[in-house]
Amino acid sequence: MILPHDISRRAFGAMVLGSTAAACAPQIDDAIAEPVLPAQEDWVEGYGPILDAGYNLPGIPARYLEGVNRRITGLYQGEAPPNSLDVDPYAKFLYHVKADGTATRYPVGVGRAGRSIRGRATMQFMRAWPGWTPTQNMLRTEPEVYGDFRAGIPGGLRSPLGARALYLFRGGRDTFYRIHGTNDLPSIGNSGSAGCIRLFNQDIIHLYNQITAPMPVLIRSPAESLRVDPENYDRGMELPPTMIAAEELIGPDAEAANRPPDLDALSPGMI
């Protein structure tokens, strides 16, 4: 079993290991293809394959989990109140802040320049295996990226929102920003979305199981990020939009691949 390494950072001191849309762009769904699973001992702890609601989620390869790009729990040194979510879009982390002074930190992917929510919001409700529909603004500004998906994509392995989604509201109104899972593994730790906050599917499932709605959310400003975590400020890179052929996500072949597997047909060791 691979154990986390090179994770400690001053801004999130005294770390210890954990116990184990909207305005969101569609991404290539690695889960549609039949996954080739490495040997069990090659999975990083907490990031192996998961069978969830009949869907077979593949594990996350170790190359995407280097350094700080994995989930850990330790002392919280940020400025958000207990029982809240603290998002640092510059260091590319999300913290679940707990009442005992600790937090679980998750690596995230965030919006490209100028495409992110800032300030305070409320996570009003949560959904498992959510569907996704591009907003009118997305269709208007980037029709070449989103036009083929204007009718939406139902929840499941094809959905760009992944295994779970948390819906952000402000002043009682939907912001159309989400905190959600993704199959676009290279985007975690980078800026590449249309504004939403992405987590590995294993991480969004872990977070979903720890929280309840409603919950306050703080999205840090540049000054807050520099003050709390200067070492990781502005880590990662900006990625271009991912162009996807419509047949990857819609059509008979995609629909067939999206169906949950027959649980009775699963062989031992498959997950």
Indicate residue ranges for each PLM-predicted region:
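N-terminal pre-domains immediately preceding structured catalytic cores
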Residues: I2-I197, N201-I271
